[in-house]
């Protein structure tokens, strides 16, 4: 992949569009799989319930060397490897009821939602001293060893993050004055729980 460049001071002139200054040993590989199912059911003419369930599985594997560039186009870069695996499950359910009190039409909605994430990660850096190159005259360098700063095992990343969000909401959409005025009143409570884990244990 053509990498992102970080300027070190003044921004250098853009290299030729047909020039690829990335290293031949860099790559990025990502796969995302999504799925969702949703259903609704009319209990009566005025009451409807719904439920939805979704899931995502993501896998990412990268070997990168994004350069930092001086104004004259000279660069330094170091190798960065990472793997990531995400599993996400989300759910949403609720009930909606329409009714009238006096001259007011109500649409009352009660809903709940929850999302759970589990993430596995590992990384490895080569020496931050890096290697020199040039945006305008790039040359291939030998791939440095990514053994300077390591977190986890790239071939078998461990769980590093858990996150759970959940919420419940109640809303009443009130229609009055023959539909000329609509007011919505609502309350919502949300809970968030996050946990972080050591990359190596």
Residue ranges and their predicted role:
Residues 1-42, 55-86, 131-156:
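Acidic/polar loop-and-plug regions of large Gram-negative outer-membrane beta-barrel proteins
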Residues 5-15, 88-94, 98, 105-111, ...:
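Solvent-exposed loop/turn elements at secondary-structure boundaries
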Residues 24-25, 47-50, 106:
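Tryptophan-centered motif/residue detector
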Residues 32-39, 43-98, 163-199:
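Surface-exposed extracellular loop regions of Gram-negative outer-membrane beta-barrel proteins
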Residues 59, 105, 109-201:
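Signature of Gram-negative outer-membrane beta-barrel scaffolds
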């Amino acid at each position: 992949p053509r990498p992102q460049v970080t300027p070190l001071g003044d921004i250098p002139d853009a290299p030729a569009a047909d020039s690829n200054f990335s290293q031949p040993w860099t790559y990025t590989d990502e796969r995302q799989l999504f799925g969702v199912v949703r259903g609704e059911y009319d209990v009566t003419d005025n009451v409807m319930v719904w439920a939805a369930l979704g899931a995502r599985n993501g896998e990412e594997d990268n070997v990168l060397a994004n350069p930092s560039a001086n104004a004259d186009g000279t660069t330094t870069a170091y190798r960065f490897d990472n793997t990531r695996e995400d599993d996400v499950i989300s759910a949403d359910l609720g009930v909606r009821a329409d009714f009238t009190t006096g001259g007011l039409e109500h649409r009352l909605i009660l809903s709940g939602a929850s999302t759970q994430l589990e993430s596995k990660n590992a990384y490895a850096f080569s020496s931050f001293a890096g290697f020199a190159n040039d945006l305008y005259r790039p040359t291939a360098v030998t791939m440095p060893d990514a053994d300077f700063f390591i977190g986890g095992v790239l071939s078998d990343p461990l769980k590093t993050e858990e996150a759970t969000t959940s919420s419940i909401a109640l809303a009443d959409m009130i229609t009055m004055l023959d539909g000329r005025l609509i007011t919505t009143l609502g309350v919502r409570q949300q809970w968030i729980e996050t946990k972080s884990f050591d990359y190596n244990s």
